[in-house]
Amino acid sequence: MHDFFLPVIKNALLSLAVSSDKPVLIERPADKKFGDFSTNIAFLIAKESRRNPKEFAGELIAHLSFPPDTIKSMTVAGPGFINFFLTPTFIMQSVEQILLEGKGYGRSCLGKGKKAIVEYVSANPTGPLTIGRGRGGVLGDCIANLLETQSYAVTREYYFNDAGRQMQILGESVRFRYLELCGVAETFPETHYQGAYIREIAESLFAGHGAALQGVHDLLPFIKSAETIIFKSIKNTLERIGIRHDSFFNEHTLYHREGSGQSANEEVIDLLREKQFIGEYDGATWFLTSRIGQEKDKVLIKSSGEPSYRLPDIAYHITKFKRGYDLMVNVFGADHIDEYPDVLEALKILGYDASRIQVAINQFVTTTVDGQSVKMSTRKGNADLLDDLVDDVGPDATRLFFIMRSKDSHLNFDIDLAKKQSKDNPVFYLHYAHARICSLLRMAALENGFDPDGSGHHLLQLLDSEPELRLGLLLLEYPQMITASIRLLEPQKMVDYLHSVAELYHKFYQECPILKAEPDISKARLFLSLATKQVLCNGFRILGISAPESM
């Protein structure tokens, strides 16, 4: 509906000789007495120009020229809000458009010609994927899906490091277990990886090489074998919940020198040094963030010579700019909350437009059964494993539960609820709404010869009861829900919206006879059901969940 209101409001502002860069937001009021849609643009402009908001809203209404039979009435409420009441005919004409656009409903050209990169999961190949990484993975995947609806050319990227200290520990862990299989008894360090997967990797090595590697002290064969097996496991786990990446970026390339040239990390240090933002003290190399008002400087290279996370992250983001991305979305866990602002500051200092970078921080996940916290660790090690969760509740519940709470909130993943076959389970509730419509359409085809691809969309304009109009209006919100979800990097808004669609459809189904109604009304209500099904399907595609036709 934004595209319907925007040009009319802009023309009215022009006729009033009012110029403003304030965005025109069209929203659904929480209370229907305040209209079907509303805008606060009059309030914003009046505040900016020191005018009386109510008076200016009245002037603006007088200059709004909508097509006939679209707006029933307009009112001014509160401090300059303009409320719009639509005609039933126009509401249902707009629902017709949903049927015409089909899978394309909600899509736009907002990002046409622009490149976006979404980086998510990005777990180093040191072990199986945890539930926490899974939440970030689903969040990133949904954000990428949302951006694609707006015509962005999206790259899904996985960033990893196979050359750090943790990989050394991984190699040592595998070697210890391998030596045990060779009959060499050594004490396994408590600081090393304890999971059963380490023994499985060692068993794979032993099966292929026997005891031939017993005298090999170079960790490389142990590291590479572990990396290959673990990465295959990670990719398989992600594929189980519908996540596939387009590219894998190895942090190790940022340390690599071409010929006699510098590595990407070294180049960052030199560029920041030229800007006088590098200091050397306490045996370490520091990013002088105290120069930009921060309390402490931040270490880039530790006294051991090992880079901190910040240095390769800065270099990595520079590669994204060099690769020509217009929008860069990073999905991080809560452990990155203190680090990423320093990366953005460094990029600004180096002349990059950090506003092209958006960061989504997702909070921790706990799993509960019978209200008690549990570990999903039935197979390997003492960790909450994503594979075990998917085994228990399935891919759809895994995905939806991960994003049905705000990314900013700690998530309590209720295993019992995720497995429940009732309307209390959000996944079941959404699936049931879609399956109910599919069942209705099958029955209509059988009993009345209804053709969902046939003519008669205009019959929708016969519908004017409150349940029908409320459902129709909600379906018209779908495109705005996409843009709001993108603006906030919050797929949860889409989950809440689709739940509302399912809820209103169930009410409409109960209150408005469909198959037993007069033929034209019956057909109109079937088309309204079909439009609802289309919105649910389009939304499910963004969330990455299935759309069952029967239950």
UniProtKB/Swiss-Prot annotation:
- Motif 'HIGH' region: chain residues: 123-133
| Keywords (A to Z) from UniProt | Aminoacyl-tRNA synthetase, ATP-binding, Cytoplasm, Ligase, Nucleotide-binding, Protein biosynthesis
CDD domains registered for this protein in UniProt:
ArgRS_core (cd00671)
What sections of the sequence does the record tag as coiled-coil?
Answer: none
User: Quick one: a GO biological-process term for this protein?
Assistant: arginyl-tRNA aminoacylation
This enzyme catalyses: tRNA(Arg) + L-arginine + ATP = L-arginyl-tRNA(Arg) + AMP + diphosphate
Give the E.C. number(s): 6.1.1.19
Q: How does it assemble?
A: Monomer.
Q: What is this protein called?
A: Arginine--tRNA ligase
Organism annotation: Chlorobium phaeobacteroides (strain DSM 266 / SMG 266 / 2430)
